[in-house]
Amino acid sequence: MKKSNRKSPTRIDEKDDICVPDSKDPGELQNMLNGGEYAPFVSPPILESNFIQVNRRGESIYLHNRANWVTVGICSSNPTTKTPNVMLLAHLTPTAQKDSEPLFTSLLTSPSPENLVLTRFLPLQFVTLSVHDAENMRIKVKLVSGRAYYLQLCAPACKQEALFCQWVELISLLNKEKAKASKVSEVSSLSEITNSTDITGSVDIMDIAAFPAIQTSHLSTCSDPNNDVESVDFSEFTDITDVTDDTDIPENEVTEAPDINIVTEVTEVTDICGVTASSGVRVVFENDDILKAKQEEKEKMENILKSGCLRDTKSKNEFRESPKRVTISNLALTFEGERCFQTTLTPEEDETEKSKEMSDRPREIRTMDSESTTLKAEEPRSRRTDSDTSDKCKLLN
C-alpha cells in the first residue's frame, strides 16, 4: 500500500490527468479565509497542505468507507507578528466528494473553495508538531490532552520534497519558539518567587526595627507592684504589620489567669474511742473545680467525729479548725480523690493501745505481774510485824 501511494501520483502526473496549481498562487484555505468570514486569520503567509490521516504503522484510516482527507494550515492570528501561533483544520463537505471518481484522483484534485469548510482552530501552545517518518513524509500532531494523530503528506510528486522540507523547517522553528517561551516562563516564575521573598523579608526587617520604638513610647504598667506587666498599643502601627485583633480586650487591660492557692492542713486525731490515733497532712489545691471534693472530705470527717466519743470538752468545730504543728517523719504520699494528697504520720501511743497490749499478753506474764504486786504489798506488812514484835520485846525487857 505504501508503494502504491508513492507511485500513483507519478503516473497521474505523466498522463496529465490533473493540473497542479502554481506554487505562487495562494492555497484554497487562504482563499477561503480572504472571503471575509474569518477576518482575524487573514494574515499571510500561510503554510497549508493536504494530508490523509494514518495510524502509527502508516495504514490509512477510513471514515465512512473513505480516506480521511484534511487540509492543515499554520498561520498567525495577529497581523503584526510573523511567528505563527494558530493551527487550522479544514475538511471537504460530503457533496464535494463523488463516488465515481478514483480515490487518488479525488485526493490530489484541488477542491473548490465553496466546498472547503473550516472545522478546527487549535492554538499552537496546546499542540506539539514533530516529524514521525521523514521517508514516508509523515508528521505527528500531539494535543495537550495526550492524544496523538499521524498525518501523511498528500501532494504532487514534483512538489512533495520541497513542501515537506518547508514543514520540517516550520516544525523546528515552532519547537525553538516553544522552548524559549518555556524558559521565559521559568525565569518569570523564579523572579516572582524572589520578589515575594524580598518583600516579606523587608517587611520583617521593618517590623523588627520599629519594635524598640514601640516599646519605648507605648509601655504602661499595671497597678499591681508585684506583677509588673507591660502592654503595648499597636493601634498606630497597623499599616506596618497589617494584623487584625478580633478580641474585645481594652488596650490597657491585661488578662490575668486565676491564681491557685496551695493550702497545707495538718490535723491530729488522738481522742476518738474505738479508732486508732492517726495524724495526717492534707494538701488541697483551692479552686472552684474542687469545692465539691473538699465538702465531701469535711462531711466524712464529721461522720468520724460523730461515731466516736470525744474525751476533750472542746467542740467539734474547734477540734476540726485548730491546726497543730507537728514534726513530720516517715512521709508516705498517697493519692486521695482527684486533687487531694494525704500523708500518714507515725501515730503516738494512746492509753487504749496500752490497755490493748496488756490484754494481748499471755496469762503467765500477767500472773507473774500479779504475784510481784502481791509480794510488794506483803513486804511492808512483814516489816511492820517485825517492828511490832521488836517493840513488844523491848517493853517486856
UniProtKB/Swiss-Prot annotation:
Organism: Bos taurus (Bovine)
Quaternary structure annotation from Swiss-Prot or TrEMBL: Interacts with CALM1.
UniProt record, GO biological process: flagellated sperm motility
Principal subcellular localization: other
Family designation: Belongs to the GARIN family.
Region Disordered, annotated ranges: 1-24, 342-397
Annotated InterPro entries: GARIL-like_Rab2B-bd
Location within or outside the cell: Cell projection, Cilium, Flagellum
Name of the protein described by the UniProt record: Golgi-associated RAB2 interactor protein 2
Basic and acidic residues bias (residue ranges): 10-24, 353-369, 376-397
GO CC, any one term: sperm midpiece
Keyword Transit peptide: no
Keyword Magnesium included in the entry's annotation: no
Disulfide bridge positions per record: none
Matching Pfam families: GARIL_Rab2_bd
Ranges in a coiled coil: none
Role description: Seems to play a role in sperm motility.
Underlying gene: GARIN2
Keywords: Cell projection, Cilium, Flagellum
